[in-house]
């Protein structure tokens, strides 16, 4: 059975970079990223490995909602300048890169789902809780920095909803980190309570007459924003990747990195 280790490139590298005392010390970054990748290979013993990078194009989410991820700090200039050299170094270690046109998350999600559907195992290396929506027994998420798999039970307890309700929660309460709006006046706690009662968005919106007038009004007025927020939070899992799995075998010969259109 194939075991595909899929690394969220900037999620890993930016956290490692943030821990380096001298922001211009790209040699230390290279050493630490190399060490991290070596450890990932040693811990997981994958048959295949890829590291997926965000691209420079404006994402379809940003086009749909211009405030998406608004206000995020840009990549530090030394890291931006040294990133290509780091990617080339990883290629010499037979860790193949995939370059997304815009956001890496959709490419990672597509890779993971395709692997799982082909009866393989996908391990996503990332701390991004958004991947928890990929609810499949052959898809897991590894937190390299805490050296543990994502604890779904703990996440569900923290969010107050089941994993299967993650997108409905984002639709109602939004996500401040990504500037996904949700419905004005509906916070995470009240959203979780509503989903505990009604289970799904569709059931909730068809049950507005059963709610108090004030809350029903908020939900009715925010219905379209909830739909937008759901779409922004939902990962694409069916991108045309046009890649050959054999090019990503662990310890295989380096090859040109593909660019994925989105």
From Swiss-Prot:
Stated role: Has flap endonuclease activity. During DNA replication, flap endonucleases cleave the 5'-overhanging flap structure that is generated by displacement synthesis when DNA polymerase encounters the 5'-end of a downstream Okazaki fragment.
Where is region (Interaction with DNA) located?
185-190
Task: Paste the cofactor note.
Answer: Binds 2 Mg(2+) per subunit. Only one magnesium ion has a direct interaction with the protein, the other interactions are indirect.
Its lineage reads: Bacteria, Pseudomonadati, Pseudomonadota, Gammaproteobacteria, Alteromonadales
Under which EC number(s) is this enzyme classified? Answer: 3.1.-.-
Q: What is this protein called?
A: Flap endonuclease Xni
Species assigned in the record: Shewanella sp. (strain W3-18-1)
Task: Write down a Pfam family by its short name.
Answer: 5_3_exonuc_N
5'-3' exonuclease domain location, by residue? 164-251
Kindly state which keywords UniProt assigns to this record, in alphabetical order: DNA-binding, Endonuclease, Hydrolase, Magnesium, Metal-binding, Nuclease, Potassium
Enumerate the PANTHER family for this protein: 5'-3' EXONUCLEASE FAMILY PROTEIN, FLAP ENDONUCLEASE XNI
Q: Which cofactor does it need?
A: Mg(2+); K(+)
Any one Gene Ontology biological process term? DNA replication, Okazaki fragment processing
Binding annotation for K(+): 172-173, 181, 183, 186
In which residues is Mg(2+) bound? 105
Q: Which gene encodes it?
A: xni
Q: Which GO molecular function, any one, fits this protein according to its record?
A: magnesium ion binding
Which InterPro entries does the UniProt entry name for this protein? 5-3_exonucl_a-hlix_arch_N, 5-3_exonuclease, 5-3_exonuclease_C_sf, DNA_polI_H3TH, FEN, HhH2, PIN-like_dom_sf, Xni
UniProt record similarity statement: Belongs to the Xni family.
* Family matches, as SUPFAM superfamilies: 5' to 3' exonuclease, C-terminal subdomain, PIN domain-like
